[in-house]
Amino acid sequence: MSRRHRAEKREINPDPKFGDLVVTKFMNAIMLDGKKSVAESIVYGAFEAVQSKLKQEPVAVFHSALDNIAPHVEVRSRRVGGATYQVPVDVRPERRQALAIRWLIAAARKRNETTMVDRLCGELMDAANNRGSAVKKREDTHKMADANRAFSHYRW
């Protein structure tokens, strides 16, 4: 790890339609090969589909989905005297958001619908209702941390 200065946090602009920074981060995470307009059309298309199906504000559904996916604790490996322990640690708020976004996109990409708009819409609605594979991933992470609670005194 470099001993020089840390990379500065880049400032990102809120998305043009909703004026939300988290939506912009989500778009940037969906984007492949620098194709921002494609990522925008996917996200906005999924939001429109959510609004037509649920008759709710799509950004509110998106934020509740992220809250339901974001983990509170995770396990990190810690080597102590020849043995490696999975030590449960609290997750920082920035990392919680990043993990939630990453897990939501991964779960959406694994779904069986034909277009990414449909997959993302389905996963957003599932996550907002505490269902879906992204929420399952969070539950598994919490179970793993709970199972290794005995090693929590190895925190750093």
Swiss-Prot record:
User: Any one Gene Ontology biological process term?
Assistant: translation
| MF (Gene Ontology) | rRNA binding; structural constituent of ribosome; tRNA binding
What Pfam families is this protein classified in? Ribosomal_S7 (PF00177)
GO CC list: small ribosomal subunit
InterPro entries linked to this entry: Ribosomal_uS7 (IPR000235), Ribosomal_uS7_bac/org-type (IPR005717), Ribosomal_uS7_CS (IPR020606), Ribosomal_uS7_dom (IPR023798), Ribosomal_uS7_dom_sf (IPR036823)
Keyword list, A-Z? Ribonucleoprotein, Ribosomal protein, RNA-binding, rRNA-binding, tRNA-binding
**Highest taxon, organism lineage:** Bacteria
Cite the record's note on assembly: Part of the 30S ribosomal subunit. Contacts proteins S9 and S11.
What the record says about family reads: Belongs to the universal ribosomal protein uS7 family.
Q: What does this protein do?
A: One of the primary rRNA binding proteins, it binds directly to 16S rRNA where it nucleates assembly of the head domain of the 30S subunit. Is located at the subunit interface close to the decoding center, probably blocks exit of the E-site tRNA.
Full protein name: Small ribosomal subunit protein uS7
